[in-house]
């Protein structure tokens, strides 16, 4: 019986086929990982807002129904600026309030530059375990803030500490909270709506 000669050209072709398959699979895995990393950012932000994880404060729509508790707590106010020519300070460095009482405090911002600038504040509270109980009704941190050259503005924060904090054994004995803000620059501010009858001076307007 005559042995058929082996076509050696088939071997590298089969190897190239396997390499192409492996490369395709690796590319798909990388694409999925990149997509997952982008999806993880909004999910992480949502998770923090929903649970108070990592000291993320909550957003309330109204004052608590229950009356304030006799127990009081000290709230300290911290302010920072990163990458903006702004002076940013709290009008009070700390206050003592009953748990459950709605309070309004003010921060002052001055744009020290000679041109308009826009920023938005990131925020958290310490210790991190109280994030779920620190309820903001109104805050300048909810939106971008644009300041004209040299402009100074007082900006309110309306908040309360949820009375449920008093029943949390993890925060038993807690007597102080620090609310911290850091303003960061907004490179591409959201365009402001133009009122009816006013010319639109934005770039590209007809």
Swiss-Prot record:
Residues in the Periplasmic compartment per record: 44-206
Mind telling me which residue stretches traverse the membrane in this protein? 23-43
Chief localization: membrane
User: What InterPro entries has UniProt attached to this entry?
Assistant: CtaG/Cox11_dom_sf, Cyt_c_oxidase_assmbl_CtaG
> Where are the Cytoplasmic topological domains?
1-22
Biological process (GO) annotations held by this record are: respiratory chain complex IV assembly
- Write out the annotated subcellular location: Cell inner membrane
Molecular function (GO) terms for this protein are: copper ion binding
Per the record, what is one GO cellular component? plasma membrane
Keywords annotated in UniProt? Cell inner membrane, Cell membrane, Copper, Membrane, Signal-anchor, Transmembrane, Transmembrane helix
Keyword Nucleotide-binding tagged: no
Which topology term describes how it sits in the membrane? Answer: Single-pass type II membrane protein
- Is Cell inner membrane included in the keywords of this UniProt record? yes
Please name the Gene3D superfamilies in this protein's record.
Ctag/Cox11
Listed Pfam families: CtaG_Cox11
NCBIfam families noted in UniProt: PRK05089.1
- Describe the function of this protein: Exerts its effect at some terminal stage of cytochrome c oxidase synthesis, probably by being involved in the insertion of the copper B into subunit I.
User: Which family would the database say this protein is a member of?
Assistant: Belongs to the COX11/CtaG family.
Record-given protein name: Cytochrome c oxidase assembly protein CtaG
Protein source organism: Rhodopseudomonas palustris (strain BisB18)
Q: What's the name of its gene?
A: ctaG
């Amino acid at each position: 019986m005559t042995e058929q000669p082996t076509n050696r050209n088939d071997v590298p072709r089969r190897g190239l086929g396997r390499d192409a398959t492996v490369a395709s699979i690796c590319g798909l895995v990388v694409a999925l990982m990149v997509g997952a990393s982008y999806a993880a950012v909004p999910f992480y932000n949502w998770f923090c807002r929903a649970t108070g994880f990592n000291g993320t404060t909550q957003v309330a729509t109204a004052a608590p129904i229950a009356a304030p508790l006799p127990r009081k707590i000290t709230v300290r106010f911290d302010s920072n600026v990163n990458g903006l020519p702004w002076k940013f300070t709290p009008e009070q460095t700390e206050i003592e309030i009953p748990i459950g009482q709605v309070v309004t405090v003010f921060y002052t911002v001055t744009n020290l530059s000679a041109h308009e600038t826009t920023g938005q504040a990131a925020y958290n509270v310490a210790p991190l375990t109280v994030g779920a109980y620190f309820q903001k009704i109104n805050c300048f941190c909810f939106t971008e803030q644009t300041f004209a050259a040299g402009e100074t503005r007082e900006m309110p924060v309306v908040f309360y500490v949820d009375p449920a904090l008093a029943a949390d054994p993890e925060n038993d004995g807690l007597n102080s909270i620090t609310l911290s803000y850091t303003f960061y620059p907004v490179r591409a501010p959201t365009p402001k709506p133009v009122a009816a009858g006013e010319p639109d001076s934005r770039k590209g307007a007809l």
